[in-house]
Amino acid sequence: MAQPRLLLIDDEPALAEYLANAAKTSGFDPVITARDEDFRNEFLANPPEMVALDLGMPVDGVELTRFLADQDYRGPVLIVSGFDRRVLESAFRLGEALGLNMAGPVEKPVRLEALEELLGNLKANLVQ
């Protein structure tokens, strides 16, 4: 069985690689994007089984959350950000209100073990 694809967007290359490595360890095939246009194009060309969004980029992660809702996306959406916990929780609630399958949110800096555990659990739920 092919590994599920995880499409992630983060404008910090080192953190994007860190997240991608955790995703690989957890059994995902990660695809990294750094710009919203690339994220949207990749999403439309090959919809992933899961998405990970950074809120703090030149394009607001909340805008991408709305994009996912407009696409009627049903896979898990993980928010990973260095913003205050209240901001993360607000973005999470917005995603839920838009009908998305929200996972997380995860605060930066991210602990590798916790991230791998979360991703492993999400992957297990995908294959059930």
Where are these predicted regions, by residue range?
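Conserved acidic segment of CheY-like receiver
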Residues: A2-A14, L19-A23, V51
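Alpha-helical interaction/dimerization surfaces of two-component signaling modules
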Residues: N21-S26, E42, L94
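Acidic, metal-coordinating helix/loop segments flanking the phosphotransfer/catalytic sites
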Residues: I32-M50
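Conserved phosphotransfer cores of two-component systems
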Residues: L44-N46, L68-R74, A97
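Conserved phosphotransfer microenvironments
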Residues: A52-R74, D84, L88-S90
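As written
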Residues: G61, F92-A103
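Hydrophobic/aromatic residues positioned on beta-strands within the core alpha/beta folds
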Residues: I79-G82
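C-terminal output helix
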Residues: R86-V87, E107-K123
